[in-house]
Amino acid sequence: MQTQISLASRSETVRTLGMRASAAPYRKEIEKQLDSGNTVVIDFSGKEATQSFVDELVGALVLKRGPSVVSKLSFKNCPDDVKSIIKFVINDRATQLSQRAIA
């Protein structure tokens, strides 16, 4: 089953999602859906996001569940700069995990 999580739903007046703390409730909802066996579509409609926000939203999932978690996520209505941030965060956290395994 697929679940969509809209980043606009809780912060309609804010255009740029920037604080780590503001990403935590979305990440918890994503984790809940993943634990239920669902794939998750993260909808960025009308939103920009900072690296800190994306790291808390996606990077924390990669650190906790491993890089394979990305196969259960998809990103919708995502601006190009946010796509670049997502790719960077995923690669950075996957590298961090692999270095931990070597150490």
State what each model feature region is.
Residues 1-48, 59-103:
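STAS-like cytosolic regulatory interaction modules
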Residues 55-57:
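A structural signal for leucine-rich repeat
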